[in-house]
Amino acid sequence: MSHNPIRPWRNIDRRNSRRIMVGNVPVGGDAPISVQTMTNTDTSDVRATLDQIIRAADVGADIVRVSTPDQDSTRALREICRESPVPIVADIHFHYKRAIEAAEAGAACLRINPGNIGDATRVREVIKAARDHGCSIRIGVNAGSLEKHLLEKYGEPCPDAMVESGLDHIRILQDNDFHEFKISVKASDVFLAAAAYQQLADATDAPIHLGITEAGGLTAGTVKSAIGLGNLLWMGIGDTIRVSLSADPVEEVKVGFEILKSLGLRTRGVQIISCPSCARQGFDVIKTVEILEKRLEHIKTPMSLSIIGCVVNGPGEALMTDIGFTGGGAGSGMVYLAGKQNHKMTNAQMVDHIVELVEKRAAEIEAAQSAAAE
């Protein structure tokens, strides 16, 4: 639950869901909304896959999914799971035996697709492997691969068909006394996905994995995911998210966190509030923000920073951020700390100075948190 007593219009009441574990990461219940991505390497190339997982983890990925289409992949999975800094989800399609092999290799979670995993007998074999090896399961319904009988029944992918697919497989898991599962009903169509997820949220208390599948490239996919996921998250639906982009998985993680930051659901690192710039700017806002984004990537402590080109909105934005800089005249601007004017700084020295202030503030916050935990 995200409650703000001062600004109640920001409140989001999260849907009540069961809590499960994906490795050491809690999903559902009152756990933070976790951010996932998926590797796009050849899984049998252990080094390349691990390198990508580590880069994703470095920018905050909580969980990483890895495709396991063949035995070479599941053989490689053992070392990948052992060396990965975050839990690994094995992505399974068509071959239920790959799920069994992935569980034996150390996967924290098995993603199965109801549209191609096979009948209940095969699913029961996957359940047994998951139980024996301490894995959770994700029921991953996708509009593009629904079961044939559902397409015949409904005529096309639709929310009813997607939710029916998911609930049918929930019953199989529950009938076999397996409850460590989460579920997704993904589509590339934002309207279809949103409607299916809303219907699903009313039908089960299982943790929900949100995603808009095949969303597109970096720009188009970011926009589509922000609309689809943002809308659902605002409604309180969603326990873990994956932004699907035809781009570096690192970008998926960054976009995922930005969506959560924008809704106040989870923060990581520096949230920069900056203007688009105009003729009034007292310094080059766009170039400054680009530099600051790169130089502040290492900061994991949540905080806010406003970089505004002039005094029209600069002082007002600075009131609501931890650190602010507002452009002025004569090659200098005003630095704000905790919403109050503090001192002037030249434009030439501003970037280095802001980085120093952010690093100092991050250290103070971390020290206070450590002291409180003792």
UniProtKB/Swiss-Prot annotation:
Keywords of the record: 4Fe-4S, Iron, Iron-sulfur, Isoprene biosynthesis, Metal-binding, Oxidoreductase
Q: Which cofactor does it need?
A: [4Fe-4S] cluster
Which top-level group of life is the source organism from?
Answer: Bacteria
Q: Name one GO molecular function term.
A: 4 iron, 4 sulfur cluster binding
User: Which pathway does it take part in?
Assistant: Isoprenoid biosynthesis; isopentenyl diphosphate biosynthesis via DXP pathway; isopentenyl diphosphate from 1-deoxy-D-xylulose 5-phosphate: step 5/6
Which InterPro entries does the entry mention? Dihydropteroate_synth-like_sf, Enolase-like_C_sf, IspG_bac, IspG_bac-typ, NO2/SO3_Rdtase_4Fe4S_sf
Textual note on the cofactor: Binds 1 [4Fe-4S] cluster.
Q: Which residues form the signal peptide?
A: none
Transport: is it a keyword of this entry?
Answer: no
Which EC number applies?
Answer: 1.17.7.3
Reactions performed catalytically: (2E)-4-hydroxy-3-methylbut-2-enyl diphosphate + oxidized [flavodoxin] + H2O + 2 H(+) = 2-C-methyl-D-erythritol 2,4-cyclic diphosphate + reduced [flavodoxin]
Amino acids binding [4Fe-4S] cluster: C275, C278, C310, E317
Q: Which family does it belong to?
A: Belongs to the IspG family.
What this chain does, per the record? Converts 2C-methyl-D-erythritol 2,4-cyclodiphosphate (ME-2,4cPP) into 1-hydroxy-2-methyl-2-(E)-butenyl 4-diphosphate.
Q: What is the protein named?
A: 4-hydroxy-3-methylbut-2-en-1-yl diphosphate synthase (flavodoxin)
Could you tell me which species this protein originates from? Paracoccus denitrificans (strain Pd 1222)
Q: Lineage of this protein's species?
A: Bacteria, Pseudomonadati, Pseudomonadota, Alphaproteobacteria, Rhodobacterales
